[in-house]
Each structure stands twice: as structure tokens, then as C-alpha cells.
Amino acid sequence: MTLIWIPLIPLMVKIVMKLVPDGKEMGAKALENPNYLDNKLIAQPAAALQLVAKEVMYCAKIVDEMIGKLQSGNGKIDKENAGIVEEKAKILQKLYASINDYFAALYSGGVLTEEQASQSAGMQSILCDIDRIGQLTREIMETVAKQNKGKHKYSKEALKELKKAMEQIQMIYGSCIRAISGNVDMDIKELMRQKEDIMQLDEKMRKNHIARVGK
């Protein structure tokens, strides 16, 4: 996560996301369209950047849901969850493109102050990280699903390790997103400790995989 940008994004502080009004489900086509961006506000960068911040946080929520789908069934990827992850990944890509187009319109308008340009760069960096996490999540889903359909399936131990890893990743990801949205203060030291735990787990998983393959 791009933590260094957090102090530069006051517009993202205390944003309260409400994804689906009244708890009603939205169709896939509606979800692919930006929920907050308004081209009529391009000439008003302060208001426009607030809308961008909300849209970025909406993308963050989508990725959080994608990661959560990789934790069900002790790491096994069933057809339903695979479809959900794939659908959300496509929605994320379209929103990512829409937000970047909106940024381009803001920049070309020549209305951003130096501070607003810095804030925009910070939000773009965070959006890029969120999109990358989402696409990597889809790749994990595709890899596991494909492997489990083949002759050499992942062992139960490997799938349990994957589930544990995704739980830890979702925890650290959630902490970052809550801090960016202004809901909690970020403990950088604790965040780095969690990151180190994930790195150690990654090393352990690799060693265990090699040991299992070598049997």
C-alpha cells in the first residue's frame, strides 16, 4: 500500500461509504458505472476531487469483497465464488478507467491548484494500488481454480495455507482502507509488523510447497 500519500489526501478523510442505497442489489451494468463522478463539476476541482475520493473508496470496497471470496471453503474456489470474483474484477477495471478519464479531464482543464494536483497524484497512486491488488486477486482465483480442475490438485494443507494468507492480507488491507477513509488512526508500526508476518508466511508457504512436491 502507498502509505506515504495518506497525509496528502485530506479530501479522503472521514468519507463514509454507502455502496447500495437501502440495501438493494444493483445490476452489473449499474455497478460498472461510476457512482459519484459528475462531469458537470470538472470546473469545480474541490468538489470534483471529493467525488473522486468516494469513487476510489468504492473501488477499495470491491477489492475487499474479492479477497473475502478467496477465503471460503478452506481455500477451494467453487464455481460461484470464481464467477463473483471475475465479475467484480471486470467492474473494477471499468471503474478504474472511468476514474482515470476523470483525472485526465481535471488536468486538461487547467483548474487544479498545486495542492490539488498533489492530492490528485496521491489518489491516483492509491487507485493504482487498489486496482493491482484486485487484478492479482483475480489471478490467484484463476490459478487455484485451474489447478484444482487438473490432474495435480493442490493439497488440503496448501489450500489451508492459502486461506490463512488471504485472511492476513485482508486484515492488513482493511486496516489501510479504514485509515484512508478516516475511520481509524493508522498505527504504522503495527502495519509494518503485519506486513512482516505476511512476508514470513509467504516464505513458509514456499518451503512447504517445495517439501510436498519433493515427496
Identify the function of each model-found stretch.
Residues 4, 8-215:
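Cytosolic, long alpha-helical scaffolding segments
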